[in-house]
UniProtKB/Swiss-Prot annotation:
Residues 112-153 form a propeptide. All late proteins expressed from the major late promoter are produced by alternative splicing and alternative polyadenylation of the same gene giving rise to non-overlapping ORFs. A leader sequence is present in the N-terminus of all these mRNAs and is recognized by the viral shutoff protein to provide expression although conventional translation via ribosome scanning from the cap has been shut off in the host cell. It comes from Porcine adenovirus A serotype 3. The keyword Coiled coil does not apply. The modification Phosphothreonine is found at residue 64. This is Pre-hexon-linking protein VIII. The keyword Mitochondrion does not apply.
Length: 223
């Protein structure tokens, strides 16, 4: 088998951290050529060479240019930011229920002395307004959900005529850190490393070692 045609390194994915856990040689793709003749060995080498050329071109097309092939933390500029339009929800109105909720609250505190019932036959009831202000009852002081403010600085900003609620789906800050499985497949195409053992040991990529730790940037038992 020609040593000039290397076997690709396959990257593994760590879904908990959103990082590539490292790369190792995919020996399952190697063909059994021990009992083959020169003609068969030549055909096998042609297939392996064609495969490597496809992987090299695929990496140039899909991989994002970056100074570190497998960074421990991906910046927001290298991650796809999914922007979704806001969601509008229709709020159903129940005017009868709203009236009951705002009109049926009895006033629990008034500050006056108790008097016989025949003197005060009128029962005081809350009308869904702010109790520390002398405001006339109007539609703008009522909330459709039946809640009214018992004390505070001003009227509610909730407009009872609004029938829709807008929800913002996207985050206010861009996403950074790890990558998803879909981006991992695009960014980490099987790596073709030409003559991996031809240079000094210090030039061999640490990320192609099985016990390499990306978080500490070290190889267990060596550093």
């Amino acid at each position: 088998m020609s040593k000039q045609i290397p076997t690709p390194y396959m990257w593994s994915y760590q879904p908990q951290s959103g990082r590539a856990a490292g790369a190792s040689v995919d020996y399952s793709t190697r063909m059994n050529w021990l009992s083959a003749g020169p003609s068969m060995i030549g055909q096998v080498n042609d297939i392996r060479h064609t495969r490597n050329q496809i992987l090299i071109r695929q990496a140039l097309i899909t991989e994002t240019p970056r100074p570190v092939q497998n960074p421990p933390s991906w910046p927001a500029s290298l991650l796809p930011q999914m922007t979704q339009p806001p969601t509008h929800l229709h709020l159903p109105r129940n005017e009868i229920l709203e009236g009951r909720l705002t009109d049926a609250g009895m006033q629990l505190a008034g500050g006056g002395a108790l008097a016989p019932r025949d003197l005060y036959a009128l029962t005081l009831r809350g009308r869904g307004i702010q109790l520390n202000e002398d405001l006339p009852l109007s539609a703008s002081t009522l909330r459709p959900d039946g809640i009214f403010q018992l004390g505070g600085g001003g009227r509610s900003s909730f407009n009872p005529t609004d029938a829709y609620l807008t929800l913002q789906n996207s985050s206010s800050l861009p996403r950074s850190g790890g990558i998803g499985s879909e981006q991992f497949v695009r960014e980490f195409v099987p790596t073709v490393y030409i003559n991996p053992f031809s240079g000094p040991p210090g030039t061999y990529p640490d990320q192609f070692i099985a016990n390499y730790n990306i978080l500490t940037d070290s190889v267990a038992g060596y550093d």
